[in-house]
Every structure is written in C-alpha cells, then in structure tokens.
C-alpha cells in the first residue's frame, strides 16, 4: 500500500471528515451568532444601563475605564448558542449514520435437513 493511498484512507475515515465539517460549520455559524449577539442582543441588554447612567451610546459607558461586561456577556452567549447548534448538528448526523448501517444478518442455523440427519444419527446410535 503506497503512501498516498494510506493517506487517502486516513483522510476519508468518518472521524476526520466529521471533524472538518464541524470546524467549517462552526466557524461560519460563529460569525452569524457573533453578529446577532453584538448587533441585537447586547444593545437590548445594555439599554437599561445606558438609560440609568444618562448616556446615549455604549462607548460612553466604557469611556472612563469601565468594565466591559457587555463584551463578556456577548462571548458567553455566543459560545452557548454555537455549542448548542453544533450539538444538534452532530446529533442529527449520528442519527442518520445509525439508519444507514444495516443490522448484520442473523447467524445461519442448521437447515431442516441437517437437523433431521442429526436426529436420525442420534437414533441409530441408541
């Protein structure tokens, strides 16, 4: 077996392909979730804090060395959403793989003629 054929066999194994798909989907979906969190969720969460501090923008809230808890919340929410969606994708892929694999056929037992032959031989020996 040559080097390239061994590499091809390794690369085409299910685990390597699944890992590659997971990384690509995770990166692409991560950007979507980041945009959703930063552009939609974070402003909604920080709006009450801005109103309480009589400020108009998020930048004013952190201009004087304030804690950027909004960025931390954004990262946490981002991680939770990406992890949950990847869990659902992997669960669906595993479910699909289980359907594709046919159960092995039951072991072939002796035929009726073989059983009758065995019974006849046992009766002869008595």
Curated annotation (Swiss-Prot):
**Domain of life of the source:** Bacteria
Q: Where in the cell is it found?
A: Cell inner membrane
- Topological relation to the membrane, as annotated: Multi-pass membrane protein
Identify the keywords attached in UniProt to this record, alphabetized: Cell inner membrane, Cell membrane, Ion channel, Ion transport, Membrane, Transmembrane, Transmembrane helix, Transport
InterPro entries of this UniProt entry?
A: Mechanosensitive_channel_CS, MS_channel, MSC/AndL, MscL_channel
Instruction: Tell me yes or no: is Isomerase among this UniProt entry's keywords.
Output: no
tRNA processing among keywords: no
From the Swiss-Prot or TrEMBL record, what is one GO molecular function term?
mechanosensitive monoatomic ion channel activity
- Gene Ontology CC: one annotated term: plasma membrane
TM helices/strands, residue ranges: 17-37, 70-90
The family assignment reads: Belongs to the MscL family.
Enumerate the NCBIfam families for this protein: mscL
Q: Quaternary arrangement and interactors, per the entry?
A: Homopentamer.
State the function annotated in the UniProt record: Channel that opens in response to stretch forces in the membrane lipid bilayer. May participate in the regulation of osmotic pressure changes within the cell.
Q: Which HAMAP family match?
A: MscL
Question: Which named protein is this?
Answer: Large-conductance mechanosensitive channel
Q: Which organism is it from?
A: Flavobacterium johnsoniae (strain ATCC 17061 / DSM 2064 / JCM 8514 / BCRC 14874 / CCUG 350202 / NBRC 14942 / NCIMB 11054 / UW101) (Cytophaga johnsonae)
Taxonomic lineage from the root: Bacteria, Pseudomonadati, Bacteroidota, Flavobacteriia, Flavobacteriales
